[in-house]
Amino acid sequence: MTQLNQNSTLRDLSIYLSANGNEFILEKILASDYKSFVRALYGAIDKATLQLEGNTKHRSEDSEDRTTIEFCTALEMAGYSAKHDIQTGGHVDITVVSGKFSWLGEAKIFNAVTEMRSGYQQLTHRYANGAPDQAAGGMLAYIKRANASKHMATWRKVVENEFKVTTLDCADRPGLAFYSESASPSSGLTYCVRHMAVMLHYAPIV
């Protein structure tokens, strides 16, 4: 593994961070536009997701708020300003700010499509204004049932058919995440939402 010292280059730092699954940190530091900010943030969110999914025995009974606070804590540890329950047209579950860039996230325990539907409507029609520096957001689906990919596929069909928006595959979490794009009611600009499963199912047979 590459060791860092005062003579290390950006390439050395990149190799070091990648070896530890933290390559998003360098991208966050170097982000000069909103697209780069969001790409790095999703790297941090994916890592936080994997950490939570690796401890389902201890997380499966957690409340929605507690799981969301754990997400915010993980993002804070990655160097972001990530706050829970900030007032922005309502009580937003996750608000991430970096300089002039911001990202809003809505989190729901996905027991039924009803919860996801209300969360998506809150995010897109109440919280986010769709400005160029706030052009993306996220839906976190805490899934405590078996077959998370099936539930995400069901939700994706609802997004497409009921809300009449375009959806795109997510290469980083195939089957467990997807994107939707629609016109923001406030700005009229494209607002991109990343819908993400967090698998918290725990039902051992022995």
Each predicted region: which residue ranges?
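Active-site beta-strand-loop-beta-strand hairpin of nuclease catalytic cores
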Residues: 95-104
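A short acidic/basic microdomain associated with nuclease active sites
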Residues: 57, 61, 68-93
